[in-house]
């Protein structure tokens, strides 16, 4: 005997578990909870009355007891007055007015009108064994389902029943008993909703035709579904041949409903899940939820605006999905992320596309803001040429510039090398020329490259007594790459060993052919020391400038390049700016690299204060928030807010770049490094007097890195060596290099206390050489085997406490006591270890030379045989060179 659980039966009937448990209790079946099992017999008891009720959806209110009692009367009414019902249909309006008040009257009418002859027979046949039980049971259940909110739905049934005013009086005495039933059937219809399929039995539905006419005019929205049930019954009745105008008119309408709405009802209600109006409503709600999830938002709502980066959680929130879905999608892409993981624009775009969204980057477009608008031809005016002096170390670049400026700046140079770029103004015959002085050492390649980019003309200084050198070639290459015309100044022609013709010959190999030899390169032979041909050199510069037609717009916002930057103790960050277009004024806001500021003061190359700087004019600017890098583009902006925003964005990008460089090794990478050999690191902190020198030293040190040892410049800045630098060196086990700077007193004391190595230099050669030596000291020494000698075993002796002793003859070299030895048997190594003792006759000896016999014992090894060969060797440690 199969059993069904309470909750399963409740789902099938389309009612709540509690309601079903109440019904079961009413028929005498005790259940403890919704998981309790019910026998089929109990289920039949429970569902038997429902079957009778569901046969006619409209007339649920009729009690089986009444039907049985009035069976004969009903037959009489149904047969005698079918026509009267149709005739009395018009008075419906009168009854409708009374619907609200006398509910009992309505019920009485229903009870009388409902029973049909066939229905009575069916009821008696099915339910005669226990007639009273279903009635009582139904009364209780309906009582439990009373819901005040459903009162409005009682109106349609009342209106239909009102069509039989003649029958109502006969049931008047029973009103009190029917009163509760009047309200309950309205609420009871929800679970009884699925009746249509079962209602297909013609016998049970034959009683409905009398109410066809009243139903049509009703237009109460909440009861739309209930009216459809009534129509279904009427249609069947009409088919059975019932008479009356109502029965004739409705069949067509009922036929349409049966083919369309009824099929839809099957799809919507029966297929998705449990039956019942209540359940149907629940199913509809669920389906609406699903549609909401699948629904694609409008195109404008599918665009998510982000600025540079966005976290996983924020992106999920804006797309209206769970963060776990995004994390799962990232994992499929090979990215392990958390809810707070930042996503760049590209990654966010990939994710959003997968979920049907678009990403719009609303970050500030720095390039667009800083882009310079083209100038009108009428706004352009002539500007002075910017001339860069380039050449090899100590070929006289600074001497030449000194001679031109008539100022002695050479005394401030260490080792004959210009330590940083200087920018100067020179006036000749009322026309100005701006000079940039670049260092000659190869470490300053980047600075020379920057100098070539901002310059109009390059003066290549070559010593007549030295000729073309490596830095000379680099200068030529930089100038050609920048497309800058070159004027060659052959310096030091006053020296007896000067050979200007040789210089021309060597430069011709580099593609610089003198005009005298049919080329287009201007050569001027000068002497900076004796001031020979200097005016001629300047005239050639101005002539070349005229050919280039150099022009700029002085009326626009200033734009230029940071030539040099340093941290001044009294003035803070100071930078030399070469204005290339526009005019820079005191009070202007600006941005340069990751720093911004406001021009608080400006000085020219002579130290005089100036209020403005036009095109091609160098000026020392005070007002930076930090020390910018040499070569950064300097742009004047309208307000501080914009400058600050651009600087902060650049700082963020710089941080991301730095983090990408210093990523931690994964376990797999670490294992690979261990397999390949341990990599050693040397950490260095560089401090200097000017930014250009710091950059040059740092770049030179980075070039010393090899596969075996890695040099990391963990910090490089301008200014004196401070306690912060020492603390950083302590934490990272670094060496501090000071270039033209000294440590503070407290920093010096802290360095001595912590044991931090602080090196101070004035010339870059010394710094590079010392670091190179330090790196060599970090490398493991190379182990090399040195052969000492070979001896043949000719006899073996067993000596107490010493084991087996080999009587040997030295074949070549010498056998040395305590040396490393190998024992070879048929040229196969059978032992490698240390010599325990070496004796000649009975005396211990230091060594035994070729051609002599000796006794040799091996450490912890006695398996010695005649004919074996003993090789002696030692391991030498050789320092590794970079």
UniProtKB/Swiss-Prot annotation:
Matching Gene3D superfamilies: 1.10.10.2480, P-loop containing nucleotide triphosphate hydrolases, Translation factors, Translation initiation factor IF- 2, domain 3
Principal subcellular localization: cytoplasm
Region (Disordered): 123-246
A Pfam family of this chain: IF2_N
Annotated stretches, region: G3: 437-440
Annotated segments matching region G2: 416-420
Basic and acidic residues bias: start-end ranges: 151-163
InterPro entries associated with the record: EF-G-like_DII, EFTu-like_2, IF2_II, IF2_N, P-loop_NTPase, Small_GTP-bd, T_Tr_GTP-bd_dom, TF_IF2_bacterial-like
Residues reported to bind GTP: 391-398, 437-441, 491-494
Database matches in PROSITE patterns: G_TR_2 (PS51722), IF2 (PS01176)
UniProt keyword list: Cytoplasm, GTP-binding, Initiation factor, Nucleotide-binding, Protein biosynthesis
One cellular-component annotation, GO: cytosol
Domain of life: Bacteria
Subcellular location: Cytoplasm
Region (G5): 527-529
Chain residue ranges for the region called G1: 391-398
Biased composition, class Low complexity, residue ranges: 236-246
Annotated ranges, domain tr-type G: 382-551
The keyword GTP-binding appears for this protein: yes
Region ranges (G4): 491-494
Role: One of the essential components for the initiation of protein synthesis. Protects formylmethionyl-tRNA from spontaneous hydrolysis and promotes its binding to the 30S ribosomal subunits. Also involved in the hydrolysis of GTP during the formation of the 70S ribosomal complex.
Family according to the record: Belongs to the TRAFAC class translation factor GTPase superfamily. Classic translation factor GTPase family. IF-2 subfamily.
Protein's name according to its UniProt entry: Translation initiation factor IF-2
Lineage: Bacteria, Pseudomonadati, Thermodesulfobacteriota, Desulfuromonadia, Geobacterales
Gene name tied to this protein: infB
């Amino acid at each position: 005997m199969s059993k069904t659980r309470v909750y399963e039966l409740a789902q099938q009937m389309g009612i709540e578990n509690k309601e079903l448990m109440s019904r079961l209790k009413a028929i005498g079946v005790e259940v403890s909870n919704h998981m309790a099992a019910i026998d089929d017999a109990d289920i039949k008891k429970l569902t038997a009355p429902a079957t009778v009720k569901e046969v006619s959806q409209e007339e649920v209110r009729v009690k089986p007891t009444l039907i049985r009692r009035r069976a004969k009367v009903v037959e009489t009414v149904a047969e005698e007055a079918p026509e009267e019902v149709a005739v009395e249909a018009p008075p419906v309006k009168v009854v409708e007015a009374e619907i609200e008040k006398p509910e009992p009257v309505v019920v009485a009418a229903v009870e009388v009108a409902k029973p049909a002859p066939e229905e009575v027979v069916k009821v008696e046949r099915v339910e005669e064994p226990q007639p009273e039980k279903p009635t009582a049971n139904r009364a209780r259940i309906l009582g439990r389902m009373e819901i005040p909110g459903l009162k409005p739905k009682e109106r349609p049934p009342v209106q239909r029943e009102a069509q039989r005013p003649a029958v109502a009086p006969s049931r008047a005495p029973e009103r009190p008993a029917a009163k509760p039933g009047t309200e309950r059937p309205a609420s009871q219809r929800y679970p009884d909703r699925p009746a249509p399929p079962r209602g297909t039995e013609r016998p049970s539905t034959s009683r409905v035709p009398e109410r066809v006419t009243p139903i049509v005019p009703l237009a109460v929205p909440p009861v739309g579904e209930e009216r459809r049930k009534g129509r279904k019954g009427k249609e069947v009745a009409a088919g059975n041949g019932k008479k009356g105008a109502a029965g004739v008119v409705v069949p067509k309408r009922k036929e349409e409903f049966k083919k369309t709405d009824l099929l839809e009802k099957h799809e919507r209600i029966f297929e998705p899940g449990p039956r019942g109006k209540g359940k149907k409503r629940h199913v509809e709600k669920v389906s609406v939820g699903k549609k909401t999830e699948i629904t694609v938002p409008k195109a404008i709502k599918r665009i998510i605006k982000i600025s540079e980066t966005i976290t996983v959680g924020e992106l999920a929130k804006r797309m209206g999905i769970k963060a776990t879905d995004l994390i799962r999608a990232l994992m499929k892409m090979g990215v392990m992320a958390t809810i707070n993981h930042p996503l760049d624009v590209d990654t966010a775009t990939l994710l959003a596309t997968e979920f049907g969204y678009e990403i719009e980057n609303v970050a500030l477009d720095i390039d667009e803001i800083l882009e310079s608008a083209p100038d009108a031809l009428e706004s352009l005016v002539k500007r002075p040429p910017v001339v860069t002096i380039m050449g090899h170390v100590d070929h006289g670049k600074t001497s030449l510039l000194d001679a031109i400026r008539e100022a002695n700046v050479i005394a401030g140079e260490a080792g004959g090398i210009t330590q940083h770029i200087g920018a100067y103004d020179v006036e000749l015959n009322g026309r100005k020329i701006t000079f940039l002085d670049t260092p000659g050492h190869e470490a300053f390649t980047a600075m020379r490259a920057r100098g070539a980019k901002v310059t109009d003309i390059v003066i290549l200084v070559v010593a007549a007594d030295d000729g073309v050198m490596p830095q000379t070639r680099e200068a030529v290459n930089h100038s050609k790459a920048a497309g800058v015309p070159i004027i060659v100044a052959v310096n030091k022609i006053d020296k007896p060993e000067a050979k200007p013709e040789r210089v021309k010959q060597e430069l011709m190999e580099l593609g610089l052919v003198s005009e005298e030899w049919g080329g287009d390169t201007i050569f001027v032979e000068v002497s900076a020391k004796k001031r020979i041909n200097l005016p001629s050199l300047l005239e050639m510069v101005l002539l070349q400038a005229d050919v280039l037609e150099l022009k700029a717009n002085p009326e626009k916002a200033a734009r230029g390049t940071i030539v040099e930057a340093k941290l001044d103790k009294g003035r803070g960050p100071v930078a030399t700016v070469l204005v290339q277009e526009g005019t820079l004024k005191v009070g202007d806001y600006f941005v340069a690299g990751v720093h911004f500021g406001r021009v608080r003061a400006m000085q020219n190359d002579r130290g005089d204060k100036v209020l403005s700087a036009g095109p091609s004019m160098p000026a020392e600017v005070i007002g930076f928030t930090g020390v910018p890098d040499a070569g950064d583009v300097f742009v004047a902006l309208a307000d501080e807010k914009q400058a600050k925003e651009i600087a902060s964005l650049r700082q963020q990008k710089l941080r991301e770049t730095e983090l990408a460089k210093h990523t931690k090794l994964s376990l797999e990478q670490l294992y690979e490094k261990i397999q390949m050999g341990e990599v050693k690191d040397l950490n260095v902190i560089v401090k200097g007097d000017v930014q250009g020198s710091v950059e040059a030293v740092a770049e030179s040190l980075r070039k010393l890195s090899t596969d075996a040892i890695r040099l990391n410049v963990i910090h490089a800045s301008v200014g004196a060596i401070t306690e912060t630098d020492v603390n950083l060196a302590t934490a990272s086990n670094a060496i501090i290099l000071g270039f033209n700077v000294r440590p503070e007193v407290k920093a010096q004391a802290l360095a001595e206390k912590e044991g931090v190595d602080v090196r101070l230099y004035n010339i870059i050669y010394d710094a590079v050489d010392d670091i190179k030596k330090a790196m060599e000291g970090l490398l493991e020494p190379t182990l090399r085997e040195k052969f000492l000698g070979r001896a043949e075993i000719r006899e073996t002796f067993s000596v107490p406490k010493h084991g087996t002793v080999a009587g040997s003859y030295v074949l070549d070299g010498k056998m040395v006591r305590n040396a490393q030895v190998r024992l070879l048997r048929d040229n196969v190594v059978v032992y490698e270890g240390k010599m325990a003792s070496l004796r000649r006759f009975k005396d211990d000896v230091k060594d035994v030379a070729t051609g002599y016999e000796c006794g040799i014992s091996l450490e912890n090894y006695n398996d010695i045989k005649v004919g074996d060969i003993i090789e002696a060797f030692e391991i030498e440690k050789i320092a590794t060179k970079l």
